[in-house]
Structure formats: structure tokens, C-alpha cells
């Protein structure tokens, strides 16, 4: 249990280091208005904090910097609330006042605004295609033998497949099948389509469509969408401005992680709990992120989680500001998507 003096000193050290990037010494602390005790007491308390693992000494300065344990305690217990400026709020809300009709574009814009406001790297994980729901399906004949199947989901995701038509199938059968599919499958999650086709659609197609077997195989193949969730990255170069990554080896390690989309995708999929989550340094359990913090939030539609928004920065991150910005973006994105889905 830390004493009140130790809590005060730890908070000031973390706040100062986040702001300046410079180690904090006892002389700097003694000049703070909040500090009313002697320099000797400051040094003793700093020594105790160091022994407890909350701060550590750098090789190039007599000052101290927060350790990972210190940052963790700060985020969990000492984080001051931050009120966003009106300009920040208006900048974020401007995204959702634009006439954007595609989920992908709305997510990309959210990622860009967030990276601009934080000066860190922003990653937004869209919903997995299999979590989308079917909105419409069209089959447009190209000639007597081929057609293009167009699948549109409730999120605006569009996928096209060129398919082979059965020999001599009447155009009226193609039209009938499209009507049956849209009537029976609209609103069904893509991951449930195969079962739904077998249990509820197959017998209807058998009654109304010639070459029923061929058409059923064709449409089942078209609806087998295995694309992973889309990942949108913005502000990657912002990390170059952080003094922590002036070391080329550290920077290369971080960029390798970002470039390995599967690894980063796996990392974000782990952070899918509701609310704000903060992972600091080695808590991310990824080599190369020892000097990074990852703050995540989920966005949803009508209470159903749809995706994840994350801000990646140095452990010396402006936690209060980033959390406030991230929370606002996630909340407003969820509201916008809920209204959009309800309208449809």
C-alpha cells in the first residue's frame, strides 16, 4: 500500500514524463506546488518507489522514469479525468454529420481522425464478414453460360462472384431463384446461411427451379464468404515522432508487428471486451511491443459488438486524453451505425 506522499510523487513523475519525455529528479519535484515536504523526504520516497518497482533509473540521467508497473498503477488508480475541448468534440462529430453510406469509409474516416487528434497510430477492426447479415443477392446473366452473383450485406460490404449457369436454364428460373433467396435469407447472418439453405430453401428451390442441384451448389459456393475482418490503419508514421523509437531496432520491431496483419489481427481480436481496455508493454504479449501501450474500445450496433478501435502509442502515452477521445469515437460510431441499421 503506497502512502499519500508516494502516490503524489508517483503521479507527478508519470505526468511530467508523459509531458516532457525527460526523467524526473528530486530537484524538479521540489519545485512543484503540491510538494510541501523536504528534498531529503522526496529522495527517500523516490528510493522507496524505486525499490517497490514503480519507477526506475535511466542510464543517462539521475532522474527517474515510470516503470511498466508504475504506468499500470497510474492508469488503474491515479488517472485524472480529461475534459475534451469543444474543438476535439466538433472534429469527431463532423465525421458522423457527413453523408457516408458505406461502413468501410466510415471506419476509415474514424481511424484517420483519431490518429490526427492523438498523434499516435490508430487501428480499427471491422466486423468479420461472417458476422454480417445478408441484405440482398442478385444474379445477373452475362451470357448463356455465365452470370455474376452479387452479395450485399447489411454493413454495405459487397462481394461478386462469376458463376456457371446450368445449360439451357430459362431466365425466368434465375429470377425465381433470386426472389426465393431474398425472401428467405434476407437478415440471416452469413455464417448461418448454409444451414438455412439446406433446411428452409432447398425444398422450395426443388419445387420451382429446373436444374435444382446445380443451382443450389452454385449459390452455396457464392455465399461461402471466408474473408477475415477488415483492418484499417492510420497514422503509422506518427510513431517516428516518438523519441522512444529513435532507436532503429525498436522501430523496426514495431513496424514488423504492424506489417504482419495476421499477428496484429490476432492481438486485436483478444481485446474484444466491452469498455476501454489498456494493455501496457509486455501485457500485450507480443515481442516488439515492450515499449508500447495499446488502448482499445469496442463499437456496437444496438448493444451487439461489431468491431474494435485501438490506439497504439508509446508507454509514455497521454492516457487520459486518448481514453477520452477513444471513448467518444466508439460511442458516436456506435450511435451512427445503430441509426443506420435501424433505417435499413
Curated annotation (Swiss-Prot):
Keywords, in A-Z order: Repressor, Stress response, Transcription, Transcription regulation
* One matching Pfam family: HrcA
Q: Which InterPro entries match?
A: GAF-like_dom_sf, HrcA, HrcA_C, WH-like_DNA-bd_sf, WH_DNA-bd_sf, WHTH_transcript_rep_HrcA_IDD
At the top level of its lineage, which domain of life is listed?
Answer: Bacteria
Q: Name one GO biological process term.
A: negative regulation of DNA-templated transcription
> Is Transcription tagged as a keyword?
yes
Q: Which GO terms describe its molecular function?
A: DNA binding
Q: Name the residues that span the membrane.
A: none
Give a yes or no for keyword Acetylation in this entry: no
Q: Known PANTHER family for this protein?
A: HEAT-INDUCIBLE TRANSCRIPTION REPRESSOR HRCA (PTHR34824:SF1)
Q: Which family does it belong to?
A: Belongs to the HrcA family.
Its biological purpose is as follows: Negative regulator of class I heat shock genes (grpE-dnaK-dnaJ and groELS operons). Prevents heat-shock induction of these operons.
NCBIfam families per record: hrcA
Q: Identify this protein by name.
A: Heat-inducible transcription repressor HrcA
Per the UniProt record, the source organism is Anoxybacillus flavithermus (strain DSM 21510 / WK1)
Q: What gene codes for this chain?
A: hrcA
Amino acid at each position: 500500500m503506497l502512502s499519500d506522499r508516494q502516490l503524489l510523487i508517483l503521479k507527478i513523475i508519470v505526468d511530467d514524463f508523459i509531458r516532457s519525455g525527460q526523467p524526473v529528479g528530486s530537484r524538479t519535484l521540489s519545485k512543484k506546488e503540491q510538494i510541501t515536504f523536504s528534498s531529503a523526504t522526496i529522495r527517500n520516497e523516490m528510493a522507496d518507489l524505486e525499490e517497490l518497482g514503480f519507477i526506475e533509473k535511466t542510464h543517462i540521467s539521475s532522474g527517474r522514469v515510470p516503470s511498466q508497473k508504475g504506468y499500470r498503477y497510474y492508469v488503474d488508480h491515479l488517472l485524472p479525468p480529461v475534459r475534451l475541448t469543444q474543438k476535439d468534440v466538433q472534429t469527431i462529430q463532423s465525421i458522423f454529420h457527413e453523408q457516408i453510406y458505406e461502413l468501410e469509409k466510415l471506419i476509415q474516416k474514424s481511424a484517420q481522425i483519431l490518429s490526427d487528434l492523438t498523434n499516435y497510430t490508430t487501428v480499427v477492426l471491422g466486423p468479420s464478414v461472417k458476422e454480417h447479415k445478408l441484405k440482398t443477392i442478385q444474379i445477373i446473366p452475362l451470357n448463356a453460360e455465365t452470370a455474376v452473383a452479387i452479395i450485399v450485406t447489411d454493413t454495405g460490404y459487397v462481394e461478386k462472384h462469376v458463376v456457371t449457369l446450368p445449360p439451357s436454364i430459362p431466365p425466368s428460373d434465375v429470377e425465381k431463384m433470386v426472389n426465393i433467396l431474398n425472401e428467405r435469407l434476407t437478415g440471416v447472418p452469413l455464417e448461418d446461411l448454409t444451414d438455412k439453405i439446406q433446411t428452409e430453401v432447398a425444398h422450395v428451390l426443388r419445387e420451382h427451379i429446373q436444374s435444382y442441384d446445380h443451382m443450389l451448389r452454385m449459390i452455396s459456393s457464392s455465399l461461402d464468404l471466408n474473408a477475415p475482418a477488415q483492418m484499417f490503419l492510420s497514422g503509422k508514421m506518427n510513431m517516428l515522432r516518438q523519441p522512444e523509437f529513435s532507436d532503429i531496432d525498436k522501430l523496426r520491431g514495431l513496424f514488423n508487428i504492424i506489417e504482419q496483419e495476421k499477428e496484429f489481427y490476432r492481438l486485436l481480436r483478444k481485446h474484444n471486451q466491452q469498455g476501454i481496455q489498456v494493455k501496457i508493454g509486455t501485457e500485450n504479449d507480443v515481442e516488439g511491443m515492450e515499449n508500447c501501450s495499446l488502448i482499445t474500445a469496442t463499437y456496437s450496433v444496438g448493444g451487439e459488438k461489431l468491431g474494435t478501435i485501438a490506439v497504439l502509442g508509446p508507454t509514455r502515452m497521454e492516457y487520459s486524453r486518448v481514453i477520452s477521445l477513444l471513448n467518444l469515437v466508439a460511442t458516436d460510431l456506435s450511435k451512427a451505425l445503430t441509426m443506420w441499421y435501424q433505417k435499413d
